[in-house]
């Protein structure tokens, strides 16, 4: 069945181009368009689309307000379009806070110069988020954990929320259908799905994520205490203009410190370094971060596999890695290297993922030592490292 899409934008040119691009995919049908947030709500209620593309700056009602209303009245996956500026990044993070699932930069130049690339990216996003878990899509949604305060009331490190209570997740042995069809030669023992993770003297915590990641990272990191004993590196698929604003937001919300990584930064306990968009991040055995130019041959900039691989080489069995919600399989090969070095790999469970792609790749490859619900990961990190 085709994915039904509602296109919302006050620019007639952009509405037409997005409609043309989406209509060229046989699996997608544009069921309607709207020119402002108010029309978007009316059309969403009338047409019941599978996905909504949403601009931010519109007359009568902006995109963020519209997203909030839509999430309350007819929860629907929303893909936001955002400008490539620091302010655009801030607004996009607010939209994700309101319940949007994902975003794309609104780049008119790319539409003109690279129409095939834009078509592939946009259609891939639409098809993917149409299958997203709406219950897990936003930190502003009804299902959001208490650890995610609203942006208008940013908490200080001293008043960050307490960890969410543990929640049991059915084990793979109890649900055989969820297990991979055929174990491979590198298959570990059945992963843990509840209980306390084994303590180990970890020198680094590495977390990789994509779609749904801004929500998931906030949910996890706000549960960590200021005296968290290990350095952290974060890899979130995100454009260059967005990672600085995202790091700043996390830093305001968390007890630990968070910053966008720069070349030469030194890893230290209680500091999380976020890989800069458009580049690659590696770590060396001296505890120093290396930031490299993004390679155009790679789909992801930053790439989880690259950071995980460097961590495996530099820290051997002393890395605790976590793969959170996201499209595709980035992180799988890096996790394989970590496992070969003796390190630990965790995956987010399907029920709490917005997109069960990256964690599924870890689980299917039999690389996961543990599979945890999003609300439990922060607590387990504390138990494993403190």
Swiss-Prot record:
- EC numbers for this chain: 3.1.1.61, 3.5.1.44
Q: Which residues form the Response regulatory domain?
A: 4-121
Top-rank taxon:
Bacteria
Cite a GO CC annotation.
cytoplasm
Main subcellular location: cytoplasm
**Family annotation (SUPFAM superfamilies):** CheY-like (SSF52172), Methylesterase CheB, C-terminal domain (SSF52738)
User: What positions belong to coiled-coil segments?
Assistant: none
PROSITE patterns for this protein: CHEB (PS50122), RESPONSE_REGULATORY (PS50110)
Tell me which Gene Ontology terms the entry assigns under biological process.
Answer: chemotaxis
Q: Which GO terms describe its molecular function?
A: phosphorelay response regulator activity; protein-glutamate methylesterase activity; protein-glutamine glutaminase activity
Q: Which Pfam families match?
A: CheB_methylest (PF01339), Response_reg (PF00072)
Subcellular location(s) of the protein: Cytoplasm
The residues responsible for catalysis, as annotated, are 210, 237, 330
| Segments for region (Disordered) | 132-197
Swiss-Prot/TrEMBL keywords: Chemotaxis, Cytoplasm, Hydrolase, Phosphoprotein
Q: What positions are modified (4-aspartylphosphate)?
A: 55
All residue ranges annotated as the CheB-type methylesterase domain in the record: 191-383
- Name the PANTHER family on file: PROTEIN-GLUTAMATE METHYLESTERASE/PROTEIN-GLUTAMINE GLUTAMINASE, PROTEIN-GLUTAMATE METHYLESTERASE_PROTEIN-GLUTAMINE GLUTAMINASE 1
Sequence similarity: Belongs to the CheB family.
Q: What does this protein do?
A: Involved in chemotaxis. Part of a chemotaxis signal transduction system that modulates chemotaxis in response to various stimuli. Catalyzes the demethylation of specific methylglutamate residues introduced into the chemoreceptors (methyl-accepting chemotaxis proteins or MCP) by CheR. Also mediates the irreversible deamidation of specific glutamine residues to glutamic acid.
- What does the entry note on its domains? Contains a C-terminal catalytic domain, and an N-terminal region which modulates catalytic activity.
What protein is this chain from? Protein-glutamate methylesterase/protein-glutamine glutaminase 3
Q: Tell me which species this is from.
A: Pseudomonas syringae pv. syringae (strain B728a)
- Underlying gene: cheB3
